[in-house]
Amino acid sequence: MRRVVILWNPDDPASKNIAESLTEDAEKLDTEDLQHYTVETWERDGVRFHLTAALGDLIEEDEARELARKFDVIVFASRHESRTKKPSLTVHVPGNPTPEAKFGGKPLEVCTADPAGMKAALLELKRFRDKRGLDYDVCYEVTHHGPRDPGAPCFFIEIGSDEERWTDEEAGEACARAILAAVDPPDVKAVVGYGGGHYAPAHTDAALSNRKLAYGHIVPDYAVDHDYLRDQFREVVDKTPRAREIIVDDRNLDSGIVERLEDLVRDRGLRLRDVEEVK
């Protein structure tokens, strides 16, 4: 079973909600002081996990490199904000797949993905939502924002998108159970996604309908550009472990971009498939 540590921010109501949900019915086993973090070890329903408070805003948590030396996977528990205030439960890899880094991290640097863990979390979010009849969208988000790559696979799990939802105990429990599911996920086929909007609807549908398909990085339409496509492609493929296929939603991608993607895929000995093929 993997050693998974959850980073939560005491100043973030959704993050606090998720952390409290995780520990409510869990047994505390141990506490360990590291240089920057105090890590608690808990067990719930036979699943062991580790929990520690962040030093500040999660998207700026560059000290997480210390955790990467000790744990297999880092999960960032966070709120999600949007202009539409849409109720949502989301997972995504952090990173900046463009030359801009407005919200933490470094330009054209992404974190190492955890496709299997994210897929297990996504499926559990949907299962719990459907079972409880919750009014939330469940989806991947595309790769965006910091922190810098800590050196271990990581992902964000988020509750959106306003104060009422951030403190919703059912949403907190959904995320808690999703994190537990990600501790020991089943084998998957890791892929990289290109195209689509911020909430990656076509890629999410493909992952939910194809049990083996598990996305790492997803690069949306608005983050693709000829000027840096080669560097971006290398970064997201290299940091999606064991990815052998690139899944493309090309409905709004320039034909020239798709042709360049085909060349890059061929040069790496990978396979390019349309998202509609894999659903």
Swiss-Prot record:
It catalyses: a D-aminoacyl-tRNA + H2O = a tRNA + a D-alpha-amino acid + H(+); glycyl-tRNA(Ala) + H2O = tRNA(Ala) + glycine + H(+). The keyword Repeat does not apply. Keywords: Hydrolase, Metal-binding, Zinc. It holds the Pfam family tRNA_deacylase. Gene3D superfamilies: AF0625-like. Its EC number is 3.1.1.96. Binds 2 Zn(2+) ions per subunit. Coiled coil: none annotated. One of its GO terms (molecular function) is zinc ion binding. HAMAP family: Deacylase_DtdA. D-aminoacyl-tRNA deacylase with broad substrate specificity. By recycling D-aminoacyl-tRNA to D-amino acids and free tRNA molecules, this enzyme counteracts the toxicity associated with the formation of D-aminoacyl-tRNA entities in vivo. Belongs to the DtdA deacylase family. This is D-aminoacyl-tRNA deacylase. It comes from Methanopyrus kandleri (strain AV19 / DSM 6324 / JCM 9639 / NBRC 100938). The lineage of its organism: Archaea, Methanobacteriati, Methanobacteriota, Methanomada group, Methanopyri.
